[in-house]
Design a protein with these regions (language model features):
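Active-site flanking residues adjacent to catalytic metal/cofactor-binding acidic residues
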Residues: 198-200, 316, 359
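N-terminal signal peptide c-region/cleavage motif recognized by signal peptidases
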Residues: 16-20
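N-terminal secretory targeting modules
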Residues: 3, 21-198, 208-211, 405-407, ...
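Bacterial N-terminal signal peptides that target proteins for export
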Residues: 1-8
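Catalytic His-Asp segment of secreted/periplasmic serine-dependent ester chemistry enzymes
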Residues: 251, 277, 319-412
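Short beta-strand segments at enzyme active-site cores
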Residues: 267-270, 313-317
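Conserved SGNH/GDSL esterase-like catalytic core that processes O-acyl groups on lipids
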Residues: 31, 52-60, 75, 83, ...
Length: 418
């Protein structure tokens, strides 16, 4: 081959590779529910699910952030000790609509090994931004339930038999926990990306109105969808930064629940209040409270992981919580010395923390007349969790340019890059 022909061949190979890369689908995380290990009957809170299912269908609603021409669904057996057999699964574009069968390597059923998860094959179902989908999963054999998401803030249903392709369920019972489904990804333009919010019950939406998508991450998703940015929640009620709580510690699950999400470009960290306040309560009677230095080291570790992956990481100050959880088994959750540690941590986050930017949620939610308390207009009533108005105020307190690194101010078109 002469020199000219070599150059032509090289150019053609390069063009072929570029075309292949350009045609590869760009997947973005559009919805998430972080998995948790199921706890025993002796725990402070009921699990809200049966110990096992056998020949049952589980149906749940998930409002995605961004839409696209195709989607795929992630099912999890993260904490299972035996294989999870799925006999069928489907997605319906809305409640009462005809479900579309999901496939896994071309088959309607799938076996998920212990500690594993599986992505479905891409489903050619065009969905819109902020669309509420219904996902159904059928388990044909006796299946101990060992992985769930406890605080779904959404009604789900358990029905006998294989009803995964039924428009309406027959003889269904309700729960607010989630099973099997941990993520929905959409095919999107190459400019689309996602923001993951890792946190505890405040991010999980513990007191948000049921079935109304009023978590603070829902409000943030509504702000960012027009810019082609999805928001997915990695909140776990009872979650902690340094130690396992009602789920793995944020340090342990950060890669899985945040950095490994497709299309992630920024992460928001709002976690730590349970680290400060659980010790000495019914949750952790004999545990020592972490020091300021230990909490700082935990935040630095998260920031280091994110930066090594080229992901922007934004911290959030811990909101006020004076008088939290009155009249409950956790009415000692708040103590003045715990609040002093929160204030020290917030001061450090504002001035010397390891994050690329900081969202001052403490300032956004506090009562100006009593800064240790949440403003009444934002308080759900338990003095720890914001209500719907408080969740909206949190989302509105986010500087989008700071969150996205100044790369998210242009309107977004779904036709771009597909």
């Amino acid at each position: 081959m002469n020199r000219f022909n070599q150059l032509v061949a090289t150019a053609l190979i390069g063009l072929s590779g570029a075309a292949s890369a350009a045609s590869a689908p760009h997947w973005v995380a559009s919805w998430q529910a972080s998995p948790q290990p199921v706890w025993g009957a002796d725990f402070l809170f009921p699990s809200l699910i049966p110990a096992s299912l056998h020949d049952h269908t589980f149906r749940q609603t998930a409002r995605i952030s961004l839409g696209g021409p195709r989607l795929r669904v992630r099912l999890s057996n993260a904490y299972g000790t035996q294989p999870l057999r799925i006999g069928g699964a489907s997605v319906a574009p809305q409640a009462g609509a005809t479900p579309h069968q999901l496939r896994f390597d071309g088959r309607p059923e799938v076996l998920i090994g212990p500690g594993q998860e599986r992505l479905s094959d891409p489903l050619p179902l065009a969905v819109q931004d902020r669309q509420a989908l219904q996902v159904s999963v059928f388990v044909p054999e006796s299946t101990p339930l060992q992985t769930f998401h406890w605080d779904g803030r959404q009604t789900s249903w358990i029905a006998p038999g294989d009803q995964s392709l039924a428009r309406e369920l027959d003889r269904a019972s309700a729960t607010t926990a989630r099973l099997f489904l941990t993520g929905i990804e959409v095919e999107a333009p190459t400019s689309a990306r996602s923001v993951v919010v890792i946190g505890d019950s405040i991010t999980d939406g513990a007191t948000a109105s049921l079935d109304r998508d009023q978590r603070w991450t829902d409000h943030l998703a509504a702000r960012l969808a027009p810019q082609g940015v999805a928001v997915v929640s990695a909140g776990i009620s009872g979650g902690r930064l340094l130690r396992d709580g009602m789920g793995e510690a944020a340090l342990a699950r950060f890669q899985r629940d945040a950095l490994d999400q497709p299309g992630v470009s920024s992460v928001i960290v709002l976690i730590g209040i349970n680290d400060i306040s659980w010790p000495g309560t019914a949750f952790a009677r004999k545990q020592a409270r972490p020091t300021l230095a230990e909490l700082q080291a935990g935040y630095r570790a998260l920031a280091g992981q994110a930066h090594r992956r080229g992901v922007r990481i934004v911290g959030a100050t811990l909101p006020p919580f004076a008088g939290a959880l009155p009249g409950t088994p956790l009415d000692d959750y708040y103590q003045p010395d715990k609040d002093a540690l929160r204030s020290q941590l917030n001061a450090w986050l504002r001035t010397d923390g390891p994050f690329d930017a900081v969202i001052d949620l403490d300032a956004a939610l506090r009562d100006p007349a009593d800064p240790s308390r949440m403003a009444a207009a934002y308080d759900s009533g338990d003095h720890l969790h914001p209500g719907d108005a408080g969740n909206r105020a949190m989302a509105e307190a986010v500087d989008l340019d700071a969150l996205l690194g100044g790369q998210g101010s242009e309107p977004f078109s779904h036709g771009e890059g597909l």
